[in-house]
Amino acid sequence: MTDTPGLLGTPLAWTPPARPAGPQMERAGNGSQGPGPLFLTSPLARGVSGVFVWAALVLTGHQIYLHLRSYTVPHEQRYIIRLLFIVPVYAFDSWLSLLLLGGHQHYIYFDSVRDCYEAFVIYSFLSLCFQYLGGESAIMAEIRGKPVRTSCFHGTCCLRGMTYSIGFLRFCKQATLQFCIVKPIMALVTIVLQAFGKYHDGDFNVRSGYLYITLVYNASVSLALYALFLFYSATRELLQPFEPVLKFLTIKAVIFLSFWQGLLLAILERCGVIPEVQVIDGSTVGAGTVAAGYQNFIICIEMLFASIALRYAFTCQVYSEKTESSPAPSAPMQSISSGLKETMSPQDIVQDAIHNFSPAYQKYTQQATQEAPRPGQGSVPSPRTPTHSPDGGPGGGRKGRNVEKRMLIPAEEL
């Protein structure tokens, strides 16, 4: 490189022409985009999450089919199938939310369905434990009058000097049922507020509905899980033959992981770890939407491991053995479909809510539910229930009617 004399005799140094500053300035000015596109919208994230989701769906779908094919103890397997459905609901819902991540916040509608089913799962697990033990009266025959074991770990440190009564079982049922009522209401309120622009994920402003819905939801789910834990600690020895530890830990892990993940992501958002603004497909989204996207991605991955754990926790072996020992043929597809329809019916939840919140509850308590064997499923009684009342009706293809027994409870025991 040589110097060329200037107009006044001073040397001028040659410099290469500068690159256009437009793209660099645009890239630097748009710091919200970062060094590259958002990972959640990349084909890698969507492909990996899709593989995990479909693997979980296949594993859980096969297990649900096995239970429906060996539907020999309906009053137990009804709740087991409901619990197993948590994987398809969580996995597919989270994957759709991830695929539709953007400025329109379509994921809120899918997440509302997922959260409502969470309440359904908590109630179903408690009801399954009740069925294992023979119903409320059978449980009271074992624990009535026994002192409550006080423990900070079990959350009973403030119950010193108290004994178990029918009121304890009623509290456990009411605490789980209230979540089944509160959660759908909060989901509906969320959808309405989002439609009017008054709800944004991660917005803790007092003028936003997110703060109040989060407070109500956390209080409701905490009460439901606390009641579930209280019931388990009170009946742990009675439930021992049914191997409840893996069942209990698996269900609580699925629910608690989603809860604490959401809380952790909200904290990271408040700390500024998640950028305030992101651009997805030309639409500007806030940090709350991005945090919800990361949670949905994590849930997609976790559901495969949850499906494996549930496969061991709620095995179909004991029910399939009943089918093999029965001389009746295997259940046809019509019986499988009717069993699935019965499983998804919320009628028992409505009846249970009316029963437990009724002022007349103090006059009676629910006895174990007895059901008739289904056609084509044999009449082998469950070892967990003393008897089965056959359906005396002529409808051979109709499901057996529920026969509920009631037992009077003295008012002073409430």
Curated annotation (Swiss-Prot):
GO terms for molecular function: heparin binding; transmembrane transporter activity. Keywords: Cell membrane, Cytoplasm, Cytoplasmic vesicle, Endosome, Membrane, Transmembrane, Transmembrane helix. GO terms for cellular component: cytoplasmic vesicle membrane; early endosome membrane; endosome; perinuclear region of cytoplasm; plasma membrane; secretory granule membrane; transport vesicle membrane. It is a multi-pass membrane protein. The gene is TMEM184A. The chain crosses the membrane at residues 48-68, 83-103, 120-140, 177-197, 211-231, 248-268, 290-310. InterPro entries: Ostalpha/TMEM184C (IPR005178). Residues 379-388 have a biased composition (Polar residues). Acts as a heparin receptor in vascular cells. May be involved in vesicle transport in exocrine cells and Sertoli cells. Its main location: membrane. SMART domains: Solute_trans_a. It is found in: Cell membrane; Cytoplasm, Perinuclear region; Cytoplasmic vesicle membrane; Early endosome membrane. Pfam families: Solute_trans_a. Expressed in vascular cells (at protein level). This is Transmembrane protein 184A. The keyword Repeat does not apply. The keyword Kinase does not apply. It comes from Bos taurus. Belongs to the TMEM184 family. Residues 1-32, 323-342, 364-414 are annotated as: Disordered.
